[in-house]
Amino acid sequence: MDTLNIAGKHYNSRLLVGTGKYKDFEQTRAAIDASGAEIITVAIRRTNIGQNAGEPSLLDYLPPEEFTYLPNTAGCYSAEDAVRTLRLARELLDGHKLVKLEVLGDPNTLYPNMLETIKAAETLIKDGFDVMVYCSDDPIIAKQLEDMGCAAVMPLASLIGSGMGILNPWNLQIIIENAKIPVLVDAGVGTASDAAIAMELGCQGVLMNTAIAAAKDPVLMAGAMKKAVEAGREAFLAGRMPRKLYSASPSSPTSGLIG
């Protein structure tokens, strides 16, 4: 069976979704159900998963028994902040080890600071975490993160929240060809065709939040993204026909024609 394998666990869905930017937890739940996602990512610094007693908790709407939580470090600008945030998440989620690391470079672009990211990844891996890492689309950096022991690399397609789609498919393709761990596109997806293209390139999965949450109809878009990821994966496995400027062979048979 064709499944996504991350840190020794298999998942049927290759679509990973965020939990932020929805109007309320009810809409969050409805969109995630429509997406079919099994892995959901949560910003520990922005979302209550038990650290704020007396306030509504995401855990009440998306129980950890139903989903694999992927705590992330959105809003962290240093390795120290990221490590501290994920250690807190591990305490709140009873020893949970699978995490998404992102260390941002500046608040305008949210581009990853790779020096701080590598520093944090080293510490987290030594501390027993399974690290899925948000990174630039630099093939050398991606390979270094794999060699360090990261569970997955997640290069950006374009800037977080931009909806610009895949701006550099060639770098993504190099990363995919060189990798022995899952490569997932993270950031920049704007619509279903972007997700399909990522999967057609050979990505093992796609992670998104804003593309669904900021849609006019988030629940409908979540369903569209599910279909796009599935179609893109099947197209990759099927193998597309070669590109040609023109074809000398007609698509219809020529034998047996009259005259």
UniProtKB/Swiss-Prot annotation:
GO terms for molecular function: thiazole synthase activity. 1-deoxy-D-xylulose 5-phosphate binds at G161, A187, G188, N209, T210. It comes from the Bacteria. CDD domains: ThiG. It is an enzyme of class 2 (transferase). Pfam families: ThiG. It catalyses: [ThiS sulfur-carrier protein]-C-terminal-Gly-aminoethanethioate + 2-iminoacetate + 1-deoxy-D-xylulose 5-phosphate = [ThiS sulfur-carrier protein]-C-terminal Gly-Gly + 2-[(2R,5Z)-2-carboxy-4-methylthiazol-5(2H)-ylidene]ethyl phosphate + 2 H2O + H(+). One of its GO terms (biological process) is thiamine diphosphate biosynthetic process. Homotetramer. Forms heterodimers with either ThiH or ThiS. PANTHER family: THIAZOLE SYNTHASE (PTHR34266:SF2). HAMAP family: ThiG. This is Thiazole synthase. It comes from Methylobacillus flagellatus (strain ATCC 51484 / DSM 6875 / VKM B-1610 / KT). The gene is thiG.
